[in-house]
């Protein structure tokens, strides 16, 4: 049976000693968000979360949620609605899907149903009402993964990896997972770890990205660190500017025209700083939507997540490392594996001129 073949919950991490019920709820909620950020769909819960995140109508109807689950994750059984009696016994049951939906909405307060449906379910909570005014059930999404660098270097940089259609997060994650299985490569993807011994693996990841080139982009912004004493605050400002200008670029180029919803996933730093920076970034992006985009940009979420299990933030790290190498190491002209990776990465997405002479709309580079 499908709901037995796929784990319902996954292996739960060990609870800290003396953990309270509320602390467990917060920890489990963050685990759900971390797995969503990495497009991990190994369990029934992962899959329910992934669908509810991208399709608003599934938050109100368990039947709609179940049908989308079958269509996306069990297509060989669902067969476009031509369900046989044998298949019906194997498809993930409505009760299983509904139980996960209820936990996600009621316990974690994520992807809440409309107020009308919450009222019918007896779960309407004014303190946790979701901002739904600007949401459109059929609105496309832009997903941005962000990394930062330069706190001890000459320049502060923020690099971002953009997926212009949220369904492509699942497709690319499937590509990467299949590559990991085929190659046995289980390590994190970090530019600093590139060596002659593993360079070919990094170049294989680059090939996967090139194959998805019509649905992704990269954007970076930099400013000298000298004169900017509060580096964390400057990096927060840079993240806002690279996203705000990136939205303008994608809209004007026609690659991702508005209206769109926006999800931002940034590499987690210190918890206290993250809470403030995430809240500030969301408010600034919402203000930018009203002032510059005629409210055609709906800021769905801004979340700090652990990058150690997130391939997409690690891809942002590869891009940022390549740019850094190009800018500060003689345009990556050496023979070191990092030079070769930087040249290959920038040539693939910028053209032969590197970051200084970008030949397409897939990369933007700005200095402040």
Model-derived features with residue positions:
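Phosphate-ester processing/binding pockets and catalytic centers
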Residues: 2-143, 148-368
């Amino acid at each position: 049976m499908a709901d037995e073949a796929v784990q319902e919950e996954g292996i739960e991490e060990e609870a800290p000693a003396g953990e309270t019920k509320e602390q467990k709820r917060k920890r489990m909620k963050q685990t759900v968000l971390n797995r969503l950020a990495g497009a991990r769909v190994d369990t029934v819960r992962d899959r329910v979360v992934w669908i509810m995140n991208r399709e608003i109508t599934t938050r109100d109807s368990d039947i709609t949620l179940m049908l989308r689950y079958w269509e996306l994750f069990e297509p060989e059984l669902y067969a476009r609605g031509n369900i046989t009696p044998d298949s019906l016994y194997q498809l993930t049951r409505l009760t299983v899907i509904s139980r996960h939906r209820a936990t996600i909405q009621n316990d974690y307060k994520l992807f809440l149903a409309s107020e009308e449906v919450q009222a019918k379910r007896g779960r309407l909570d004014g303190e946790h009402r979701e901002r739904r005014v600007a949401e459109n059930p059929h609105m496309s999404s832009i997903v941005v993964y962000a990394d930062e660098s330069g706190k001890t270097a000459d320049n502060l940089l923020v690099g971002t990896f953009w997926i212009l259609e949220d369904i492509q997060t699942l497709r690319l994650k499937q590509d990467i997972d299949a590559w990991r299985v085929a190659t046995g490569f289980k390590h994190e993807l970090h530019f600093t770890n590139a060596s002659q011994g593993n360079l070919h693996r990094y170049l294989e990841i680059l090939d996967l990205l090139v194959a998805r080139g019509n649905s992704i982009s990269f954007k970076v912004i930099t400013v000298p660190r000298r004169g900017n004493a509060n580096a964390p605050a400057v990096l927060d400002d840079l993240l806002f500017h690279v996203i705000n200008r990136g939205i303008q670029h994608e809209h004007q180029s026609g690659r991702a025209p508005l209206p769109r919803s926006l999800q931002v996933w940034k590499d987690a730093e210190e918890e206290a700083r993250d809470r403030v920076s995430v809240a500030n970034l969301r408010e600034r992006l919402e203000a930018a939507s009203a002032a510059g985009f005629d409210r055609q940009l709906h800021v769905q979420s801004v979340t700090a997540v652990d990058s150690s299990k997130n391939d997409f933030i690690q891809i942002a790290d590869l891009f940022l490392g390549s740019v850094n190498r190009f800018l500060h190491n003689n345009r990556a002209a050496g023979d070191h594996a990092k030079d070769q990776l930087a040249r290959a990465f920038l040539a693939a997405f910028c053209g032969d001129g590197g970051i200084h002479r970008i030949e397409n709309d897939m990369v933007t580079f700005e200095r402040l």
